[in-house]
Design a protein with these regions (language model features):
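Short, glycine-/polar-rich solvent-exposed loops and beta-turns at beta-strand/coil boundaries
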Residues: 3-8, 71-79, 154-159, 253, ...
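Surface-exposed extracellular loop regions of Gram-negative outer-membrane beta-barrel proteins
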Residues: 134-150, 159, 257-325, 379-380
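Residues embedded in well-ordered regular secondary structure
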Residues: 43, 64, 76-81, 91-99, ...
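Outer-membrane beta-barrel translocator/channel fold
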Residues: 318-340, 346-352
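Flexible glycine-/small-residue-rich
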Residues: 14-16, 25-30, 72, 85-89, ...
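Solvent-exposed, polar/charged alpha-helical surfaces in well-ordered, non-transmembrane soluble domains
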Residues: 35, 39-42, 47, 55, ...
Length: 380
């Protein structure tokens, strides 16, 4: 520092002093600078989470932490995902990492009682896990511990790594109120395995019947081949009384999602607080599939003398409606009906009533729309 006499005309030039903040690693027994942490770990702040338009914490993690792979086996809203840290460690046993939220280990497997805890398969074709109950806006940071240090911190449960989640806490200063909301729509990104409409399919089969006549009936002429096709076409491509069926449009729709989040934080040198409420509602692209979630979070910290008291409460209520997306309830995957059933397999009768069964090779000829309306699953 330099002291000069005051004058009416002074020019002050400040030189820059570049300083960088060390990345912090949160473990089971304290916080460390990354430069001083000897284990294999990676951390991510909420700055990368806030602008990702997804209700799933796993979707926001995907591709942001080295060594962590996240894959989904279902497009069901709220469905659990596979989380693998440095690949699979076992063929028969579980490979899910331990999840620790604010120092408390939680169940990292499937929370649905009707499903396998590791694969999610079973009566409910999708399942759900603890991360589905979290509001990503409440997360301050996520640390992934990848090596043997995880087992030394948390025991054998951490053999597949640890996902350490730290939620937001209050800070001294003016009380700040934050509100954000977003809306969105979803549909099938790819027209997977396009199918023929009724007229095109009938014309193709008609030509196939004529070709069959040419190859297998002696003395076939153009007229007799056409007569053979006319006599047999309705056995393979009959037009229903109320028109051709469009199973893709009948089974799938445009999905939607809405998300509302409100939080308040503040405090002084002694007492700091953070509180939040959120509501999320997501409708899937299959009828009767969706997720409704409400969360509440309160973190309070108070210092008196040499002592410090931290109190944290997190409440979450979630309702998940599951269609037969991956094969469930002794029925096949509802998405496969698009390819098993054709335009000739009627959805409704001539009076517009939904048929219980339809002529086709799907689920012993049961109408998948009827099944979905009467066999969907609900997880609370």
């Amino acid at each position: 520092p330099q002291t000069v006499k005051a004058s009416s005309n002074m020019k002050i030039v400040l030189t820059s002093d570049n300083k960088s903040l060390d990345e912090v690693i949160v473990t089971g027994y304290g916080n460390f600078k990354k430069s001083s942490f000897t284990g294999a770990a990676a951390s991510m702040s909420t700055a990368k989470l806030s602008d990702v338009p997804s209700l799933s914490v796993e979707d926001k993690l995907s591709g942001n932490i080295p060594g962590v792979s996240i894959s989904s086996f279902s497009g069901q809203p709220g469905a659990m995902n596979y989380i693998r840290i440095r690949g699979m460690g076992s063929i028969n046993a579980g490979n899910d990492p331990l999840i620790v939220i604010d120092g408390t280990p939680v169940n990292s497997g499937n929370l649905s009682g009707f499903n396998d805890a590791q694969t999610g398969s079973g009566y409910n074709g999708s399942g759900t896990n603890a991360l589905s109950t979290l509001n990503s806006n409440d997360i301050e940071s996520i640390t992934v511990i990848k090596d043997a240090a995880a087992a030394s911190l948390y025991g054998s449960r951490a053999a597949n790594g640890v996902l350490v989640i730290t939620t937001k806490s209050g800070s001294a200063g003016k009380t700040q109120v934050d509100f954000r909301s977003d809306w969105g729509f979803s549909n099938m990104a790819i027209n997977y395995r396009p199918t023929l409409d009724g007229d095109s399919r009938r014309a193709l089969i008609y030509q196939g019947l004529k070709n069959y006549a040419y190859d297998n009936i002696d003395g076939t002429t153009d007229a007799s081949a056409a007569a053979f096709a006319d006599a047999n076409i309705d056995d393979y491509a009959a037009k229903p009384e109320n028109g051709w069926a469009n199973w893709r449009d009948a089974l799938f729709k445009n999905g939607s999602n809405q998300n509302y989040q409100a939080s308040v934080t503040g405090g002084n040198d002694k007492t700091k607080f953070y509180a939040s409420l959120s509501y999320a509602n997501q409708n899937g692209i299959v009828d009767r599939s969706g997720l409704e979630r409400m969360t509440g979070n309160v973190n309070v910290s108070h210092r008196f003398g040499k002592f410090k008291l931290d109190a944290s409460t997190m409440i979450s209520s979630m309702h998940q409606n599951s269609a037969m997306d991956g094969g469930a309830s002794f029925a096949g995957a509802i998405s496969s009906a698009v390819w098993f059933l054709g335009p000739s397999n009627a959805i409704y009768d001539k009076n517009g009533n939904l048929l219980t069964k339809t002529d086709g090779a799907y689920n012993n000829s049961y109408n998948p729309i009827y099944e979905n309306q009467h066999m969907s699953d609900r997880t609370n």
